[in-house]
Amino acid sequence: DAVRSKLDQPLPLGYCNAGVILESDVEGFEPGDRVVSNGNHAEVVRVPKNLCVKIPDNVDDESASFTVLGAIGLQGIRLMQPTMGECFVVTGLGLIGLLCVQMLRANGCRVLGIDFDSKKCERAQKFGAETVDLSKGEDPVIVAQGFSRGRGVDGVLITAATQSDEVIHQSAEMCRKRGRIVLVGVVGLNLRRDDFFKKEITFQVSASYGPGRYDSFYEDEGNDYPIGFVRWTEQRNFEAVLDMMSSGMLDVKSVITHHFDIENAIDAYGLLDNPDALGIVLNYPSQSREVLTKSKVELNVQSTKDSDPSTPCVGFIGAGNYASRTLIPAFKEAGAVLDTLVTSGGISGVHHGNKNQFTTASTETKDLWNNDKVNTVSIVTRHDAHAQQVVDALKSGKNVFVEKPLALTLDELDVIDKTYHKANKSNTVRLMVGFNRRYAPHIVKMKEL
């Protein structure tokens, strides 16, 4: 059931977009600013400040939307530490590979591009690279020797996707002594020791778009790394890519092959296996601020309209694994009317709301506190959010079922105690904490021993 539940749940796609700020509570960004971010493909995204960068005035939104992809390639290039006049191989001339060709050329390097697709090789040539067309039987190692004037190339940037280990082997053969290999794509990694030992070749895997990636301290909490110690964070890589677009050193328009309105996104994803497809742009329609910023969606208007007033009418905060697989079904089976589901992400709220016949899906808890139909609130959120949500629910006169823990500190517990007794004087309310593990079969058995 757990596996089926996961497979059934929709996941937000994409991580490259450009748009206009609607709301901002951080310094440096104002409503109306044009920005790029790594937010998902959606009409509205909420993005941490370190993953968002303003777009220069002379860069159009369409080109800017490729900034994050450019930063993925740029981070791989930074790891190779190229210097002017060096020669590099780019293996795999897809979208990121072609962007890397341009950035290496802008850095004063000679570039040899390798691919099976003749058309992609032709594109790379237009950007100033020499190429190896594998579909014509050309040997990349022999060509690389000639390209490097018999010395071996200074480095190889792998932007290909294949299960074969041959890419790594050939990369090592192409390199000079102490050459560099950086993997941006995904290839087989059964390395041959001799390939690297004799030449002292370095091999490194590039992690996405730069320092800060996957670090909650940087991304979620918004703390920057000091520039004196980390010159190129992921945000500063975004800026560098946009600067190259602004100066004309990075031509994105030439790699855009298709445009789709978001209503036809399925057709766009159907092109991913098409060798002629490179840059695919999804366009969203212009909508009013009121439509874009609405916090709730009506799902099943009939579900509570004619319900018995004595029946528990429940609102849920949280739809994680335990809530969606265990608690919501348990309330539903017990005969409770499910009214409002509040989640931090709209996708999960609408999905689980429709699945369990909730009336409304929302991203704001105020839609529960101000809902007179809801008499009971179930809180299944992060532990540090429980106390304040319990207090708010009690103040609004709701019965509360909260998953353990009720609070994290004695001060929080004291506030809950006072709020509960005050609420109970004016309107009888119930507060219950769910210690669900006490009913686990093993715990029950242990108590019996």
Regions inferred by a protein language model and the residue ranges of each:
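N-terminal Rossmann-fold NAD(P) dinucleotide-binding loop
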Residues: 97-98, 323-327, 386
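Mid-domain Rossmann-like dinucleotide-binding core that forms the NAD(H)/NADP(H) cofactor-binding site
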Residues: 60-137, 142
